[in-house]
């Protein structure tokens, strides 16, 4: 479900590339930096026919707050039961500050106009994510 509690499917974007980026939690420092970088790159992404979908396990009601607070200009999706994350292989064991737990890994997928995964972005700093994506698109 998107921030307006409406269902969204990849097939809604046929003919466009989709950057499906998984992020752990709305309104946290790293996730905010990543989202704002994509927000500020929207014109360049539009030129490349790329739609951005941010996906987290946040409840739907949290997403509009993130959009409003940071003036985000793309769709956010709630995957509370992490079913989509599991399909993409980005849900699993994480280690942070000596703790181990299941969680969402920060990985992005560029999906081509036909719905096929074209590229996986899994090595980047949150502040550089947008530039890593743009560099790939411009090569």
Summary of predicted features, one role per range:
Residues 1-139:
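Chalcogenol-based redox active-site neighborhoods
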């Amino acid at each position: 479900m998107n921030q307006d509690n409406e269902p969204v499917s990849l097939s809604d974007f046929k003919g466009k590339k989709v950057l499906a980026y998984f992020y752990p939690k709305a309104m946290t420092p790293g996730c905010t930096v990543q989202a704002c970088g994509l927000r500020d790159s929207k014109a360049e992404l539009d030129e490349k026919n790329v739609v951005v979908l941010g996906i987290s396990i946040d409840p739907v009601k949290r997403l509009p707050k993130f959009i409003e607070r940071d003036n985000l200009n793309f769709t956010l999706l709630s995957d509370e039961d992490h079913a989509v994350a599991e399909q993409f292989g980005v849900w699993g064991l994480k280690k942070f500050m000596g703790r181990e737990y299941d969680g969402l890994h920060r990985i992005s997928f560029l999906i081509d106009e036909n719905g096929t995964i074209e590229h996986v972005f899994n090595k980047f700093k949150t502040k550089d994510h947008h530039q890593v994506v743009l560099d790939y698109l411009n090569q």
